[in-house]
UniProtKB/Swiss-Prot annotation:
This is Sodium/potassium-transporting ATPase subunit beta-1-interacting protein 3. It comes from the Eukaryota. Interacts with atp1b1 C-terminus. GO terms for cellular component: plasma membrane. One of its GO terms (biological process) is regulation of sodium ion transport. It is a multi-pass membrane protein. Belongs to the NKAIN family. Keywords: Cell membrane, Membrane, Transmembrane, Transmembrane helix. InterPro entries: Na/K-Atpase_Interacting. The gene is nkain3. Pfam families: NKAIN. The chain crosses the membrane at residues 5-22, 35-55, 62-82, 151-171. It is found in: Cell membrane.
Length: 179
């Protein structure tokens, strides 16, 4: 009943995925990015389900995790395309906020090395409580930080997918041999 290498590795990968998703969730909350917040929340739930299935020898839960990783990879590929403006997508749209606010990625103003300052608004613009800012000196632009986050998610998901398939195979083989 010891922990086999595949199960332990999958538990480690799921734990790492959860930590990375929680980090991403925090920064998406700071930027009011509602679509990624919802996606991250679902991802965290399914990763917990995958962890439970791995620890409790429940292959159906691991299958659900495996199916979700395919959707998660597709979502992160979309985010990469969105921030790199591939295929007619534009990072300047309100798509990530479900078109309910003008917020953007938190990294846009707070990236490494970024210095921002308030810029006076043109008198013709009525901004309410919003203001113009100018961001300069960023070591890495915010869209590339978002792409790096998504690439890490894709890498972890692909590794998790492979190990989940292996663990499902091992668990079902053990069930078949015990009957």
């Amino acid at each position: 009943m010891g922990c086999c290498t595949g199960r332990c590795t999958l538990v480690f990968i799921c734990t790492l995925q959860m930590l990375v998703a929680l980090e991403r969730q925090i920064f998406d909350f700071l930027g009011y990015q509602w679509a990624p917040i919802l996606g991250n929340f679902l991802h965290i739930i399914v990763v917990i389900l995958g962890l439970f299935g791995t620890i409790q020898y429940r292959p159906r839960y691991i299958v659900a995790y495996t199916i979700w990783t395919a959707f998660w990879v597709a979502w992160n590929v979309f985010i990469i395309c969105f921030y790199l403006e591939v295929g007619g997508l534009s990072k300047d749209t309100d798509l990530m906020t479900f078109n309910i606010s003008i917020h953007r990625s938190w990294w846009r103003e707070h990236g490494p090395g970024c210095v921002w300052r308030l810029v006076p608004a043109p008198p013709s613009k009525n901004l309410g409580d919003h203001s113009f800012i100018s961001v300069t000196g960023c070591i890495i632009e915010y869209q590339y930080l978002e792409v790096i986050h998504s690439a890490v998610q894709i890498l972890l998901s692909l590794i998790g997918f492979v190990y989940a398939c292996y663990v499902i195979s091992v668990i079902t083989d053990e069930e078949d041999s015990s009957t």
